[in-house]
């Protein structure tokens, strides 16, 4: 990824750093429009997810998370920008004439070949079941339910590690630090998701954030008491509480928000680290 640094000619471009290499030219048969209504609002128009709204119109790219074209070699033709995720995507031309998008593996270049199946080589971009992978393999786009497609480790730079196999289950260490069990028959893609330097980018101004559909974030301490528990006071006043709270009065730091009776509770060996 090539990071382009702006010259400090105006305040809006000062400290700006964007990716200037990957462009977007999607295929018409692999995109479709989405109807986004509300953008953070519920059916009554009330805000349920803050800091969302506006943004440029998007076309959704059909991504092949299942990788079910077994034993058919494909060639990477393009590496494109996807407005719906922070990872890049690759256009694959398969030997049977089919064309699909997949997540861009780190280090993959135009012209590389990939394949998915049960007895394929352990090579970056290839997809195969966990039972056929050696221990210590770096993987991404991991299935939770067999045949449903990859659901874990899909963000830019995400990578998980296969650390054990016992019985019908495989033990994975996820990017969050969580260690959990998954069926050995589930598939995953070898390697790490590309665009590792996504955190190095700096948009430089609030208007660029608005193009992405992200509205400004206002601190509660500068609000009025009617708007936030931290609000009010004369001048720069403290929050007036022992610990910070959310706009609805719940503890903001340290409180666990995961439901206790989830089906996957028995599959998690170690909860994610902070």
UniProtKB/Swiss-Prot annotation:
It comes from the Eukaryota. Keywords: Chloroplast, Plastid, Ribonucleoprotein, Ribosomal protein. GO terms for cellular component: chloroplast; mitochondrial large ribosomal subunit. SMART domains: Ribosomal_L2 (SM01383), Ribosomal_L2_C (SM01382). It is found in: Plastid, Chloroplast. Residues 1-22, 225-274 are annotated as: Disordered. The keyword Ribonucleoprotein applies. Its main location: plastid. One of its GO terms (biological process) is mitochondrial translation. Gene3D superfamilies: 2.30.30.30, Nucleic acid-binding proteins, Ribosomal protein L2, domain 3. Part of the 50S ribosomal subunit. Belongs to the universal ribosomal protein uL2 family. This is Large ribosomal subunit protein uL2cz/uL2cy.
